[in-house]
A protein has these predicted regions:
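Cationic, low-complexity basic patches in intrinsically disordered or flexible, solvent-exposed regions
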Residues: 9
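Predominantly long cytosolic amphipathic alpha-helical stalk/bundle segments
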Residues: 102-194, 208-211, 247-278
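Helix-termination/interfacial motifs at the ends of transmembrane alpha-helices
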Residues: 39-62, 68, 177-255
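Short, membrane-interfacial amphipathic segments enriched in basic
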Residues: 15, 53-62, 155-166
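Hydrophobic membrane-targeting segments
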Residues: 20-108, 252
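Hydrophobic alpha-helical membrane segments of integral membrane proteins
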Residues: 78, 126-129, 203
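Residue-level signature of catalytic and energy-coupling elements of molecular machines
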Residues: 73, 87, 125, 140, ...
Length: 278
């Protein structure tokens, strides 16, 4: 176990090459994302050229999407922060999991390992792992080393050897899983938070609309329309952010489930091979 941990610290595929650069590029804090969102809101969406008479207090130009979003009000930068976070973490997770899967097809890797084990060729199985790399290959390599260690051990009974191999598989998997699941809880939180922020913006917009209706006993048409626009824009923006977060979370969770299933399949084959040949 200790040897596996040291090896992992020295060479983790998730922290290598392009994936490492992507992770460094996207490792902003929530505060930094908020600053970016505020800049987008004021300087891009709130650009005077998006509005009638070059005045952000007026209605957006007909068909001007940027000006329309700007009218969503103060909640828009908050929802933009959540949206930027989802997009950035989704990109980071994509490259991280691509590295975790290794260089080749996971299904083909599992099939090749099982074929090598069926032939009793542990050395070939290790060579396949060296070519594949990634988290799955790391776990299998660690388990195969324990396999060879138990083969040379003459003091332990067969049952304890099998338990030792199984334990090594579980511990190696437990070390890899946190990195594969990193940032997914944040995306899962945004699935709800994005919708709630949209709802908050909707409520604020409706409050402004009713305030315009009640002011002076008559309706200020511009204030009324701005309040309704704010409500609808925030609703749409919040739902969009929540939907993207749900899609991202489910996609990456499914990828991790496939990887875990592959590990379980290979691990079972290793244990069964040892049980059948010793």
């Amino acid at each position: 176990m200790g040897a596996y941990f040291l090896k992992k610290q020295a060479r983790s595929p998730i922290l290598e090459g392009f994936g490492r650069n992507i992770y460094a590029l996207l490792s902003f804090s929530g505060q930094q994302y908020f600053i970016i969102a505020v800049c987008i809101y004021h300087f891009l969406l709130g650009n005077p050229s998006n509005f009638m008479n070059n005045d952000p207090n007026n209605h957006p130009l007909p068909g001007n999407f940027l000006g329309t979003i700007y009218k969503g009000g103060i909640i828009v930068p908050v929802i933009q922060t959540l949206l930027l976070t989802v997009l950035a973490l989704s990109i980071e997770r994509y490259f991280a999991l691509r590295s975790a899967f290794g260089k080749g097809s996971l299904a083909k890797f599992v099939a090749n390992i099982k074929a090598a084990l069926a032939a009793g060729d542990i050395k070939k199985a290790q060579e396949i792992c060296d070519k594949q790399r990634g988290s799955v290959a790391n776990v299998v390599t660690s388990t195969l080393r324990k396999y060879e260690e138990m083969e040379k051990n003459t003091s332990l009974p067969k049952e304890q050897k099998l338990l030792a191999i199984q334990k090594e598989l579980e511990e190696a998997t437990a070390l890899e899983m946190p990195m594969m699941q990193q940032n997914l809880p944040i995306i899962a939180t945004i699935t709800t938070l994005g919708t709630l922020m949209g709802l908050l913006g909707t409520v604020i917009g409706m409050i402004r609309s009713f305030a315009a209706l009640s002011a002076g006993g008559g309706a200020d048409s511009m204030a009324l329309s701005q309040g309704i626009s704010e409500a609808l824009i925030n609703t749409a923006f919040g739902i969009l952010t929540g939907a993207l977060a749900v899609i991202s979370y489910n996609y990456f969770t499914n990828k991790i489930d496939k990887l875990t299933y592959g590990l379980d399949e290979v691990g079972f084959s290793i244990v069964q091979t040892f049980a059948a040949t010793h």
